[in-house]
């Protein structure tokens, strides 16, 4: 029985790469794939799905006025699977049309996309997918601080995190960065830099402690085997207080 799948993740989590690899796997088994993308995504060419690792493939472009179910019947009725990239930009009606392909044609549909915008608001298309998808999977990635990234932060020309503006503003690594919820709180990267500095201090303390431990160990060996300060052990006690 076919299912509607939604695989979501923050920017840079390999969503497009996984979509293209899934397409390759189906085609390697002589299966016909209908790859689609919304017309609003024109970053890498209007009819191309592109991944940061260099993979790319031509796709059927879907405009907001298109009925995906009707297009499927007209253009690709013999497809074995439908794969959608940037699915968050589809309308709620178009998500229902993908659901209809699954139910009436018994064809699996795999949707890849973002969950939320730069203000952590759910995209309408993604919201509908959460409501009607049979299988929902998170594609995980990390923030620059090492925590799990869930926020698609929009970066302004001044390098600060933007907190207002239109929901849709196309861009790649120059405009967006996947972050955890903590990093963009101060609206800039000072918090991360501060944390990095603190981690550096912690590392320095660790190195100092290790050095003191080695020094104490060496002195202890000399004391044990060569009898240094044996007559007055208190002279070496201070070494063990470092």
Give names to the regions the model predicted.
Residues 102-125:
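Sensor-1/coupling segment of RecA-like P-loop NTPase cores
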Residues 89-90:
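Residues immediately C-terminal
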Residues 197-212, 217-222, 231-234, 239-240:
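N-terminal amphipathic/hydrophobic targeting modules at extreme N-termini
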Residues 224-226:
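Low-complexity, intrinsically disordered or signal/transmembrane-proximal segments
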Residues 1-71, 117-128, 141, 170-196:
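Conserved P-loop
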Residues 22, 93-101, 125:
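A short acidic, amphipathic alpha-helical/loop segment
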Residues 124-175, 186-188:
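Phosphate-binding/switch region of NTP-binding enzymes
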Residues 86:
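Walker B catalytic acidic pair
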């Amino acid at each position: 029985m076919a299912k509607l799948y939604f695989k979501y993740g923050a920017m840079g989590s390999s969503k497009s790469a996984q979509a293209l690899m899934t397409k390759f796997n189906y085609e390697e088994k002589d299966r016909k794939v209908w790859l689609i993308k919304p017309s609003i995504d024109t970053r890498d060419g209007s009819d191309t799905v592109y991944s940061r690792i260099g993979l790319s493939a031509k796709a059927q472009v879907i405009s907001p006025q298109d009925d995906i179910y009707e297009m499927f019947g007209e253009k690709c009725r013999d497809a074995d699977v439908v794969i959608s990239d940037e699915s968050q930009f589809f309308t709620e009606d178009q998500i229902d049309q993908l659901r209809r392909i699954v139910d009436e044609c018994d064809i699996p549909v795999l949707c890849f996309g973002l969950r939320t915008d730069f203000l952590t608001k759910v995209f309408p298309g993604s919201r509908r997918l959460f409501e009607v998808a049979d299988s929902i999977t998170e594609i995980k990635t990390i923030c620059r601080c090492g925590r799990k990234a869930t926020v698609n932060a929009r970066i302004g020309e001044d390098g600060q995190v933007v907190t207002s503006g239109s929901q849709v503003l196309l861009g790649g690594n120059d405009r967006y960065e996947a972050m955890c919820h903590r990093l963009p709180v101060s609206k800039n990267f000072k918090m991360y830099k501060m944390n990095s500095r603190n981690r550096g201090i912690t590392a320095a303390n660790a190195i100092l402690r290790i050095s003191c431990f080695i020094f104490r160990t060496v002195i202890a060996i000399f004391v044990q085997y060569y009898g240094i300060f044996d007559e007055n052990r208190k002279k070496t006690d201070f070494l063990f207080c470092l």
